[in-house]
Amino acid sequence: MIKEMAIANNADEVDNEVRAEKGRKCFYLKKMIGDYIGNTVRIVATVVLADFLQRLYRSVVEYVHCSKYYLPEDRLWTILRRSCTYSNKSRYLVMGFILIGFLRISVSGNYKDVVPTFKFLAYMPLYWIFSNLGHSTLTYSSWVRDSHGLDYAAGMASNYFHGYLKLSLPERKADGLLHRMNVYEDKYNVTFGIKRLIILIPDEMFINGVIQSRILEKATPLETQFINRAGVNRPFKHAVYRLAEKVNGKTYYFAMEGATPMLSFFEAMHSNFSATWQMKELKREIWLKFYTHLNELIKTWPETRNLVELIIYNSHDTKGDLVDVGEMLKSHMELKTKNIDEMIG
């Protein structure tokens, strides 16, 4: 009997030790999770404070040394507004950590668990030193691709559209692109393959003054259009090319030109006075963004959406040979006439 009681007591002691061990593990686990959450909130609070102080410092420097970029009456407000601009992602993250901080305080009952101590604040200079560590050429690439209208490519596309295409193409006083093309067809008894202005955008960005092709011949241009622009009666001209090889027994003409801003950018890249390594490194991003933004402007504006045909292409084929623009147009017309024949048939 006594032996059985001793065995039972030993079993109880073992059970108690097991429960105590589980309790200790559970306690340490909860403490570890609580400390992790508290330290995470402290680190985030330290980073936010360091960022705020950095923005404040830059605001002071901007106010003192860059006053010429602001109007006197709203200089302070504009600088503060710009310095306190945060992305939506940053705002949501900070709000999330603030919520986590309040939850931590509600559990522990001690606000000191989430307030940064001097040990954390002492690391703020590291943020100031390494805050630009994440910047790279990829950062510039992402910035160029964003839709803000401030990059080189979007600026070229906007100037090209608002200063040229939007002025010369729409119909105003019987001088729009379609009217001039119809007059041209009647006058010379020809047919345009595409009743739009074709704009070539090769990735090489270079286009000769006369578009080179084995099967393209330069013809008489469309009638010159004169438009008053900023006090100057500017002439607007559109070149016309004849496809030397017939498609289904018919000769086609095309109003066609290269994207002049791309040619200007090509020249800027190869000039010792204006070229930068960033321009050369990101030229493909600029080329694609120019096309994307210009296409968006053309499609958005009602007067131009059906008047322009953008052709973006690689200047060289897989063998390294120059792509023949005339061959591209011929293939396009062959496909177009084939589809029409199939519809009729």
From Swiss-Prot:
Listed result of changing R234A: Impaired binding to 3',2'-cGAMP
Subcellular location: Endoplasmic reticulum membrane
Residue runs in coiled coils: none
Alphabetized Pfam families for the sequence: STING_LBD, STING_TM
Keywords carried by this UniProt record: Antiviral defense, Endoplasmic reticulum, Glycoprotein, Immunity, Innate immunity, Membrane, Nucleotide-binding, Transmembrane, Transmembrane helix
GO MF term set: 2',3'-cyclic GMP-AMP binding; 3',2'-cyclic GMP-AMP binding; cyclic-di-GMP binding
Predominant subcellular localization, coarse grouping: endoplasmic reticulum
Effect after changing N159 to S/A: Reduced ability to recognize and bind 3',2'-cGAMP
Residues the record marks as carrying a glycan: N88, N189, N272
Biological process per Gene Ontology, one example term: defense response to virus
Effect on the protein upon substituting Y164F: Does not affect binding to 3',2'-cGAMP and subsequent activation
Any GO CC annotation of this UniProt entry: endoplasmic reticulum membrane
Gene3D superfamilies xrefs: Stimulator of interferon genes protein (3.40.50.12100)
Substitution effect: R229 to A/H: Impaired ability to be activated by 3',2'-cGAMP
The protein's name: Stimulator of interferon genes protein homolog
Organism name: Drosophila eugracilis
Lineage, top ranks: Eukaryota, Metazoa, Ecdysozoa, Arthropoda, Hexapoda
